[in-house]
Amino acid sequence: MDKLYTPNPDGYCGDEDNGQTSAWYVFSALGFYPVAPGSGQFVLGAPLFRSAKIHLENGKTVTIEAPDNSDTNRYVEDLDVDGKPYNLNYVTYDQLTSGATLKYDMGSTPNLTRGTADESKPYSFSRSADVPKVKAKKSRK
């Protein structure tokens, strides 16, 4: 994100797609993105900033804190949501619109155990267990 998107005339790579590219960038820079619209979930990633606030129309505020975030500390070690340990890999629309506080503990190496349980996974259009098996058709030869 810090190499392909810059504040220059050629700062967006590729086609802007009617604002979709910049919307992706803003969400991703905040540390979450609505991968499956309509699911009510925002998949978590690593925020670009150490601190950000989103003031919502309903008067609530979404606060994102990642005080140790840096070029070397780019991995999510742990996450607290509203002051409690949080092991899911997504937040919900309802959480955000209620004025959530996301506090990221960032580190220099990936945490390979956080968010690995099945219940931690976000909604998917095609989980491997849900994908029907397709039988190969016999060749006409």
What residues fall within each predicted segment?
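Non-catalytic C-terminal accessory modules of carbohydrate-active enzymes
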Residues: M1-K141
